[in-house]
A protein has these predicted regions:
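N-terminal beta-strand/alpha-helix entry module and adjacent surface
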Residues: 1-104, 108-157
Length: 157
């Protein structure tokens, strides 16, 4: 059985939804790939970073990014990110580029697993705590597959 998109119920509860266009500037992708290639071997395949930029109506511009150190805690069986480092970098970035703000995160994966979902939850909480400083009410999640499967770089926002 297949369901046509037009047959699905309207779940926007009467809200107007504008499409957002996302422009990823040229330095972002090499930064993410470099972060992936320089990660410690014991870290696994996952790298995480922060996306920064601007939003103007329906246009999101991702101008900057920075890597966020993380490690896998084997005892707690959880991914731990260096939140203190991330907060310091965000504060520094706001001084250097006051027009750019926090947009979300990047993660090296094809699809979100339990670690990716935990990171997404963390960034959602960060956005809730930084409502005055975040440019949008929800974090963008940019998934990058750095393995270049099929000789293509897969990026999903």
């Amino acid at each position: 059985m297949t369901t046509q998109f037009s047959e699905l119920p309207n779940l926007n509860f009467g809200l107007t939804v504008k499409p957002l266009h996302c422009l990823i500037h040229p330095t972002i992708t090499p930064n993410i790939l470099d972060h992936y290639l320089r990660k410690p071997e014991d870290q696994g395949d996952l790298v995480v970073g922060t996306l920064l930029g601007t939003i103007d109506g329906t246009q999101i511009d991702i101008f900057s990014s920075f890597a966020v150190p993380q490690y896998y805690d084997k005892e707690a069986k959880a991914l731990v990110i260096d939140t203190e480092y991330m907060q310091k970098m965000l504060k520094f970035h706001r001084k250097v580029n006051p027009n750019e703000g926090l947009l979300g995160m990047y993660i090296s994966c094809k699809k979100l697993d339990e670690h990716g979902l935990a990171l997404m939850k963390y960034f959602s909480e960060l956005f809730d705590n930084e409502k005055k400083k975040a440019l949008i009410s929800f974090p963008l999640i940019m998934m990058v597959d750095p393995t270049l499967s099929d000789n293509k770089l897969s990026i999903k926002v």
